[in-house]
Amino acid sequence: MNYLVTGCSRGVGLEICRVLLEQGHTVYGIARGFSNEFQQLQEENQEHLFFKSIDLSDSENVRKSIFKDFISNKLRLDGLVNNAAMAYDDIITNLNLEKLKAMYAVNVFTPMMITKYAIRNMLLHHTQGSIVHISSISAHTGYKGLAMYASSKGALEAFSKDTAREWGELGIRSNVVVPGFMETSMSSTLTDEQKDRIYKRTSLKQPTCIRSVAETVSFILSDKAGSITGQNIHVDSGTI
């Protein structure tokens, strides 16, 4: 199977690539930067892991930068993981429109455009493909300072549900995996006290395991999840 994964170079995106490679799939990864961890993974999987550096804030050039210069119509795409994201954290009264637009470009507009062309590829090859969007528990549980970021993930979740309804008749599935708080570069600026407050809101009193999220994504991409579409699957250490 051939899978496209955005935000592949670190964190949960890197782990998703690792899990898919372990299962014998071929992964086409895109991200702004190229991490040492991804480089090592690519060296270990030279024939099955490919990378292209792309500015994911440039939503208008998705077709050329990804689906012409990287993944052509000759390649059958079996699945897509929209994982790339950026955070814009602040309280609502400090909202900056330019920063909000920049975040929405990466978190909403580009994933929507990538989905558009991924579905076109699936239609061309008569593929019953699977699309997985990575959201955030912040879209479901209120956190101070995360209103803007949470709203972008909420938009992505609504888009996924309608995508599922629109294309399900042709066997194309769309789902969302909703991770809880994970120890990633996006959370590195939080203090231990802030992290402890987040942990206390979970049933397991611990961060969400990145590997668990990646394994869930792999399952949703697979035929084993063939009857699952239009859903939000929470992997969040029981944040209730």
Task: Describe the predicted segments one by one.
Residues Q206-V235:
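C-terminal substrate-recognition "lid" of short-chain dehydrogenase/reductases
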Residues A87-K101, G145-M148, M186-T191:
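Conserved mid-core segment of classical short-chain dehydrogenase/reductases
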Residues N83-Y88, G238:
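Conserved NAD(P)H cofactor-binding loop of Rossmann-fold oxidoreductase domains
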